[in-house]
Amino acid sequence: LSCSIGAATHTGHARHLVEELIKKFGRDHPINVGNGSVYLEAPHARLVTGIKPKTLGDLEDIVEYCEKEIVHLLSCCHTGQEGDNIDFESKVFHAGMIDHVAMEACDMAQISTYNFPKADPEAPLVEIGIGTIDTHKPVILVIGHNVPPAVEIYEYMKRNGLENDVELCGICCTAIDITRHTQKAKIVGPLSHQLRFVRSGVADVIVVDEQCIRTDILNEAMKVNAVLISTHYKNFQGLPDRTNDPTDEIVNDLVSGKAPGACILNSEKAGEVAVRVAVAIAPKRRKMGIIPEDSQIVETAKKCTQCYSCQRVCPNNLPIPEAMKAAAKGDLKPLANLYERCIGCVRCESEGVCPNNLHPHTLMVGASRIKIREEKFKIRAGRGPIQDVEIRRVGGPIVMGEIPGVVALVGCANWPDWKANALIAEEFAKRNFIVVATGCAAMAMAMYRNEEGLTVYEAFPGAFDAGGVLNVGSCVSNPHISGAAIKIASIFAKRKLNSNYEEIADYVHNRVGAVGISWGAMSQKASSIASGFWRLGIPVIVGPHGSKYRRALLGRKDRDEDWYVYDARTGERVYVGPTPEHLFFPAETKEEAMVMIPKLCMRPSDTTKGRSIKLNHYIDLYRKFYGTMPDDIHLFVRTIADIPVTMKDEVLKILKEKGWKESKVPSPDPTLLPRMIRKRRE
C-alpha cells in the first residue's frame, strides 16, 4: 500500500505537470533532455512500455499506462486479494517500477520546457542555506514539488524588473527545481528546515503546491503574519478558491489582512499575486518572527521540570532535558548542539507533551541563531540525465569492478544527523566511487564544509565518473540514476532495451555495482522509489528510521544454496557468494552503512582486479570503524588474485582458518535466467 501511494503521488504529479505544460507549450513541443548528448533519453519508458517519447503529447500515453497499473495495484490491497507473500512482494516491486516510469516522464517534461540544465556535468553552483537569504528584501518562500508556480513567480519578477529587488527561495524539491530554472533563486534547505524558517518570520509570502508540506502550515504562517497561497487542488489548506477572482481584488484582500491566504490554481495568476503581495506587505511586517532572544530562552528554560516527556516523544531521542537544564544556567551551547540532529517534526511541542507548555524546538532554533546565520553553502544545480558518452566511458570499469561502484544518496530528511549524507558522499568520492544524489539528501550533502572550507560539490567534479559528485535533481529525477544502470546495459553491453525488463534487470543485478542510500527515508514516495531500485536488482540502505517501514529484504550468507547463478557460457550452475547480500537493509549508524556500501557493490561479474579493489574498501572501512577484520571475507574471495596486495598475509591466514577453497569458475558470465544460456555443457 505504501509503495502504491508513493507511485500514485508521483504519477498524479506527472499527470498535473504534463497537462499544464501541454496547455502552455503545446502537445508538439519536442522532448530535449540532453542537447544532443542524450540519444537514449527515456530508458524507463522504453524498457517498460516500448514508447520512445518525442513530444510532450507522447508523455501523456506513458502517464496513462502508469495510472492504469496503479489502479490495479491499489485493488490488490483490498481484503481477500493476494494470498502469497512472494506474489505480493512482486506487486511491491511492480509499484516501484511504475513509479520510476512516472517520475521520468515528469522530469523530462520540465527539463524540456523550463530550460533546466540538460545532462550538464558543469551545471552551475547555486546558493543554499538560511544565511543566504537577504532579509532586507521582500521574501517569497515556495514549498513542495510542483515547480510551475515558482517558475511563474520568477518570470513575473523578471518581466517587471524585480529580479534583484525580491528574494525567491524554496524548501524541498520545488527549491531544487526553481534553482535549475534560475540561479537567482536560493534554497533554504531540506524538508526538516520548513518550520524553523517559517517561524523565523523572514518569509513575507509562502506559496505551497503539493507533497511534503506541513498540515499546519496555515497556522504557522498566521503566527508570523505571513500570507499563504496554495496553488494545487491536492492541498487547499482550507483556503477559499480565488482562481477566478480579479487579481487586484485578491491582492487587496491579502495585503489588508482581510484573508490569511488564498487558493489560486492558475500558476501565472498565483505568481503575480505572490510578488505583488510580498512587495506590498514587506515594509509593514518588519519580518516579525517568533524565535526568542537569548535572555528569553534562559528564562523559559528555568520552567523546565525535567519530566523527560519531550525526549520520550523525540524520534531521535535528543537529550532535550539536559540541554534545557544547562540553558537555565545561561549555557545555550548544549541546546544549540541539538539543532543539526533535529528533524523539525515538533513532536516535543505537541499538545499535552510538556506540562508547562514549553516549546523546545523553538528554543533550540533560537539558541542556534549565530549558527543559522552562517548557513551559507553552495550546491550544484540539478543536472538531469547522464550523458550517453559518460555511460560509454564508465560502463566497462563499473561492470568489471575497476570503478568500485555507484553510490546514490536519495530520500527524505528523517535522519539522525544531516551531516551523515555529506560524510558518506565525501568518503566514497575520495575512494573513486561515483556519488549521485537527489532531493533532500542532495541538499543535506551541501550543508557541510570540509577542512578546506569547501562543500562536496565544490571539492569534487560534477561528471559521472570516478570521484564525481552529482546532484541529478529533485525527487522526480531519481529515474536518471536507475536509468544510468539501464543505459549501461543498453549502451555498453548492447542489450535490447524495448520491453525487455527481465534481461536488463538480470544484467544490472549481476554486473552493475550500485547501491542506493536513503538515510532519512520516511515517506511513501521513498518506499516506492526504493522498490523501483530493487526491481532492477540494486540494493538500498536506509537509516535508523527506515526500520519503521517494518520490512527488510535480507539475504542469508550462511545458506550457500542461495548464491548460485548460471554461467551463460556453459549453462553450469556456479557459486558466486552473497553478491549482493541484501536488497533492503536498515543501518543503525552511518558507520554501519559505510561498511555495507562496498560490500553491496560486489557483483558476480567482477574481474579479479575489480574484486580486489572492492574488498580493499570493504576491509579498510570495516577495520576503520570496528577495529578488526570482517568475519565473512572468505565468502567474497574467489581466487588468490582477488585478495588486495597490501592485505594478502592477513587475509590468507583467515582463509586458512575458514577452510576456504578456490572457486572453479572465478569469473563466470553470470545470469539468473535459463534462457540467457548460450551453450549448455554436455
Question: Which residues does each PLM region occupy?
Answer:
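Anaerobic metallocofactor- and corrinoid-dependent redox/one-carbon enzyme cores
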Residues: L1-E682
